[in-house]
Design a protein with these regions (language model features):
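A compositional/structural signature for long, glycine/proline-rich flexible linkers
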Residues: 2-378
Length: 378
């Protein structure tokens, strides 16, 4: 596959055009996608039918997400926000309390983001360079917290995204010349009552009309799809293997590593691996620090959140039952132990887990221990 050009016409003798005309571009894409399946068959992956089945499903989800982003909404001259992760597309320990939006941009251009604040508990805007479909990482190049937004009386806002700060003092999201994406994170404590922010983006320093599809663009998009599926699945499998080395613990995750993978710089992450027998439970005790938000969640080997549509697989400051002293005890088990704050493993006896402190200045480590199901105390 070849690099993209900006031309809308092409020399019929060009090799990229020839690959499109004779079908090689599709055949090479399918062959490369097939090779991405090696991550599911790796010796390090648990020899468990559920993990394997979820692995194959995971690759279809990554492929679907990548096709949507790189094929349908990939033009930085005419960007739009799309759901990067949702209830059936998951990756990288996606947060069940979050709604993630992403739009492609080019750091050398200038954009306006318009929206209404809504009542969502936490809202953040990040500019990022690279991408799982480009470099295999997402480096933060700028960040704007909704707490710093200037709003009008109706809760509306405008943000300028650019390399240079606007001279009129407008809300500004800093970009770098290498910035390639803007991500919006919305975090809810109460999923039923909080109103999500509404956001849209447009280029303001030139035409904002989508370019026509070309052989070069289709070639580049398919290449990026394969790279995302391959790189993201391999990277997060490596994370899971690291967590497995010290099971049933929740140490703080390297902040630099989290940010390089696209994590929010305002969040302290505690990642771990749970490993249980059928008659065991994992007890997680926390004393949340003063912070904007906290939660605890379960995920599978592939760092996909478990199915939060139908099972209680996560708790936050609004849904967890607290003790009188403010501490919280949560219990991870495959069957209900009959105590508050049970998190359902959805049939898994092992998997990954994460605690987040958002906007904290102190970082207490969660305390974790394994007990027999019949010995769980509230």
């Amino acid at each position: 596959m070849t690099d993209e050009t900006d031309t809308t016409s092409a020399d019929p003798t060009d090799d990229t055009v020839a690959q499109v005309m004779d079908g090689r571009v599709w055949a090479e894409f399918c062959d490369a996608l097939k090779e991405a399946g090696a991550v599911v068959l790796a010796d390090t992956v648990p020899m468990d039918p559920q993990d394997r089945a979820e692995g194959w499903r995971y690759l279809t989800r990554l492929t679907r997400a990548a096709l949507n982003f790189f094929m349908e909404t990939s033009d930085p001259e005419a960007p739009s926000f799309m759901r990067a992760v949702d209830e059936t597309i998951k990756m990288g320990m996606d947060n069940p309390d979050n709604v993630y939006l992403a739009a492609p941009v080019k750091g050398t251009l200038t954009y306006r983001i318009r929206g209404t604040r809504g009542t969502v508990h936490y809202l953040g805007f990040g500019s990022q360079a690279g991408g799982y479909g480009k470099t295999g990482s997402l480096d933060t190049t700028g960040y704007l917290d909704a707490g710093d937004l200037v709003l009008d009386d109706d809760g509306r806002f405008e943000i300028i995204a650019s390399v240079e700060r606007p001279s009129d003092g407008a809300n500004w999201l800093r970009m770098a010349p290498e910035t390639s994406m803007i991500q919006v994170r919305q975090t809810r404590v109460d999923h039923r009552d909080e109103v999500l922010a509404q956001v849209e983006i447009e280029r303001i320093d030139g035409p904002s009309t989508p370019r026509s599809i070309t052989p070069e663009r289709i070639d580049k998009a398919l290449e990026e799809v394969v790279f995302l599926v391959t790189a993201a699945s391999a990277m997060f499998a490596e994370w899971a293997e690291d967590f497995r080395k010290v099971p049933n613990t929740l140490p703080r995750f390297d902040p630099d590593k989290a940010i390089t993978a696209g994590g929010d710089p305002n969040i302290a992450y505690y990642h771990g691996w749970f490993e249980l027998a059928e008659d065991e439970a994992l007890v997680v005790d926390i004393t949340p620090p003063e912070c904007d938000f906290w939660n605890f969640q379960l995920a599978n080997y592939w760092l996909e959140s478990l199915d939060y549509r139908y099972h209680q697989v996560h708790l936050n400051q609004g849904t967890a039952q607290h003790r009188p002293d403010g501490s919280v005890r949560m219990v991870v088990a495959a069957t209900d132990p009959g105590v508050p704050n049970w998190l359902d493993t959805c049939g898994h006896l092992h998997g990954t887990m994460c605690v987040r402190w958002v906007g904290a200045t102190e970082f207490p480590e969660p305390q974790v221990h394994v007990v027999k199901l019949g010995e769980v105390e509230p």
